[in-house]
Design a protein with these regions (language model features):
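Short coil/turn segments at alpha/beta junctions that flank glycine-rich nucleotide-binding fingerprints
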Residues: 2-6, 57, 78
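Short, charged helix-capping/linker segments at alpha-helix termini
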Residues: 6-7, 121-124
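Amphipathic alpha-helical packing segments from all-alpha helical-bundle domains
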Residues: 44-47, 94-119, 127-132, 139-142, ...
Length: 179
């Protein structure tokens, strides 16, 4: 489905998967169900990457960097699978929209939990910041990949981390006056 949902035919999908069309239909009643199964898999991959990044350290600057890098790695390394999540040509399909919205929310909630715990900000305030951090991460990662700018991934992550850290570091750690 690299060319998009509407241009993908079940015959082509079966051929690329190395199975017969009847075998494909044994597992998936139709193209939408196959698409949703792939979407679920890739949404879970993104969520796992974000959660792993957040849990990788207790140093908040390194956490920001790891989380930014998780989005860049996902966009770069998933063989274009990020397009199923972020650039789907089926965003008007309710089942697709629900899954994309859910993974965006789950990623933001994971980020928000860390912000709330570390800063003492309310859940609502932390969530607002988390949606911003997650959104900027995925949009910039997608831009970085599509622009062909030649900026190495680690440099792009470092630049975005610096931008994000200068903002989020302004919220003192819970119970202190320090960053």
């Amino acid at each position: 489905m690299a060319q998009g949902y509407h241009s993908a035919a079940m015959d082509d999908i079966a051929e690329r998967a190395g199975v017969s069309k009847p075998v494909l239909y044994q597992h998936f009643p139709g193209k939408l169900e196959l698409y949703l199964a792939l979407l679920d898999q890739h949404c879970e991959s993104l969520l796992h990457a974000v959660r792993t990044a957040l849990a990788s350290t207790t140093d908040n600057k390194l956490r920001v960097a790891a989380t930014m890098d998780a989005y860049f790695a996902y966009v770069e390394d998933e063989g274009g699978a990020f397009r199923l999540v972020f650039e789907s040509d089926l965003t008007n399909e309710p089942a697709v929209r629900e899954r994309v919205d859910r993974v965006s929310l789950q990623c933001a909630e994971a980020i928000s939990d860390v912000i709330a715990e570390d800063t003492g900000l309310s859940k609502e305030e932390s969530m607002l910041l988390a949606v911003g951090l997650g959104g900027v991460s995925q949009v910039v990662a997608r831009y970085w990949l599509s622009s062909g700018s030649g900026i190495p991934r680690d440099t792009a992550v470092q630049l975005l981390t610096s931008l994000a850290w200068r903002g989020i570091a302004g919220f003192p750690l819970h119970g202190t006056d320090q960053h």
